């Protein structure tokens, strides 16, 4: 499945912002994979923290090959050593095993999370060991399909904003301005900012001072794309 959006969302954003309009028209529609199964999505995002998308995919595929469908019963029964054998750290294996146990015991109600507002869902998800605000926001976007997620904690979003709008830095106040401008379709804006940060428009450059760029690598919370997702774009009139 892909994150669902269409003309309504893009036309709204294009009317709100000339530079984003240019970016949307240049890149075309973006297909971004989603995982509607909240349980497996949480696991996938925990695995992907602070590692490359390639490494995450390798670990994830090993788990799928071993277990088939990931359920709380299967993961809880596997135990930490078995989870580690797929290539993840002890800490991540501990988080994942604990999460599965909490779901089984009813401590974490996934159905309730799906029905919550964005704010309440983020608050609840960050109460789970191993999940911070950035991870919770990515789960809302790429599992629950929430339409208005723009993450200040994602350094690639900040990079995309710098590149598109020629800023040297993105302060919280400046970020809130863009968050308000793109609402209620911040998630769609995120897709295009990630694409810009990943080099979809070659002539765009990062305006951050060189010392800042050298000090920040593109990893979790700073990814060119969220590590658990595959994104491709298609345009009726591609430009080079």
PLM region spans:
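Alpha-helical ds-nucleic-acid-binding substructure associated with the helix-hairpin-helix region
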Residues: 19-23, 51-52, 56-129, 181-183
């Amino acid at each position: 499945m892909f994150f669902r959006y269409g003309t309504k969302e893009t036309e709204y954003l294009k009317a709100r912002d000339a530079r984003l309009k240019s970016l949307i028209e240049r890149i075309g529609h973006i297909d971004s994979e989603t995982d509607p199964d909240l349980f497996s999505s949480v696991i996938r995002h925990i695995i992907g923290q602070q590692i490359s998308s390639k490494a995450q995919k390798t670990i994830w595929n090993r788990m799928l090959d071993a277990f088939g469908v990931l359920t709380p019963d299967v993961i809880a029964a596997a135990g930490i050593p078995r989870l580690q054998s797929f290539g993840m750290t002890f800490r991540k294996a501990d988080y994942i095993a604990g999460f599965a146990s909490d779901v089984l015991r009813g401590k974490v109600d996934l159905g309730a999370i799906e029905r919550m507002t964005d704010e309440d869902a983020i608050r609840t998800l960050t109460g789970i060991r191993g999940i911070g605000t950035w991870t919770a926001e990515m789960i809302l976007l790429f599992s629950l399909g929430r339409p208005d997620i723009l993450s200040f904690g994602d350094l690639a979003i900040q990079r995309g904003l710098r590149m598109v709008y020629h800023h040297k830095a993105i302060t919280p106040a400046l970020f809130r301005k863009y968050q308000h401008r793109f609402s209620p379709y911040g998630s769609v804006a995120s897709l295009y900012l990630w694409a810009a940060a990943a080099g979809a428009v070659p002539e765009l450059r990062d305006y951050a001072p060189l010392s800042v760029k050298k000090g920040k690598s593109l990893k979790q919370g700073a990814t060119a794309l969220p590590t658990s997702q595959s994104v491709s774009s298609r345009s009726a009139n591609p430009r080079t």
